[in-house]
């Protein structure tokens, strides 16, 4: 099994003229998952966007297998699943059609059983045929979350993945992340909830606040 590593090297992040954090450094290797903690406004979402290559730090760099993510964008994005605050789905398509489109875009097997299983895990089977524009914001986010049961990407970066699901769904997702990491995957996430798992490592951004 090929081992991957994401290294966060002395990152600094600003919002406007306000420096949120600096000197942020840690690493995540295959088999590990890390919860990013910190008080509101410290820059947790900003950090995840930097790790996903969607924003630039004012200092420092992010390395994937010893090379800057910006020097190997195609290779990095091929291994990255990012869930931000926006669902990133097509509102004119149904939940089922969105997941089928995702399977095609990722070159996955067009497996109906896997697709229905993913919808079941986020409690959307009964709404699978509705255009996503008819779904609530929380339900649309669950459509995006269902992709986690389809993706083969190794690195998951998830911003508040538990907000749109009930307690049973939270338990299912935690077990799914644990299984993903046990098979050589890795995950970095934020959450206001306490994650009941002895396998998760926590990192507080507060320690990097000026």
Swiss-Prot record:
Its EC number(s): 7.6.2.5
PROSITE patterns (alphabetical): ABC_TRANSPORTER_1 (PS00211), ABC_TRANSPORTER_2 (PS50893), CCMA (PS51243)
Localization: Cell inner membrane
SUPFAM superfamilies hit by this protein: P-loop containing nucleoside triphosphate hydrolases
Catalytic activity field: heme b(in) + ATP + H2O = heme b(out) + ADP + phosphate + H(+)
KW Repeat (keyword) present: no
Protein name: Cytochrome c biogenesis ATP-binding export protein CcmA
Gene: ccmA
